[in-house]
């Protein structure tokens, strides 16, 4: 499992968290939760594949070659959708906010979970849980105005979080992902 960490980092996945793979597959106890911050965006722009679902295909093109034959990848954009948020909380990657966004202790809400890789092996030792998100007044106000079907209110919720503001996605990345939401597609 640990042999994959440098390759995933080199591919642009700057969030990789070990977890107990039994959460997805009892026969594959070693797991890696794979995510990224805005650092992956320039790589996507340089490689942007033509055709439908370019970001999802880009993610797969980076991860698939790194996965051993005896491992399984559960992508966040493919059905059945894996419980990536639950895995993030259980593994100690972040805490769940009242909005159901996972809040990373450094990046805040400005990261994305892409895949869970499970393989034979020993699970990692239990990780300490991240302290629960404590919404201050800006977060409470944004939460009170949150409309589940309005992408602008979701963006306002992320912007209200004081954690990780310096890791906010660039405007073109926000536009790309929230344009998908406006069209009714899953956002990655």
Regions found by a protein language model. Give the residues of each.
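Catalytic cores of enzyme domains
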Residues: 31-32, 39-42, 51-188
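Non-catalytic, usually N-terminal nucleic-acid engagement modules in DNA/RNA processing proteins
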Residues: 1-64
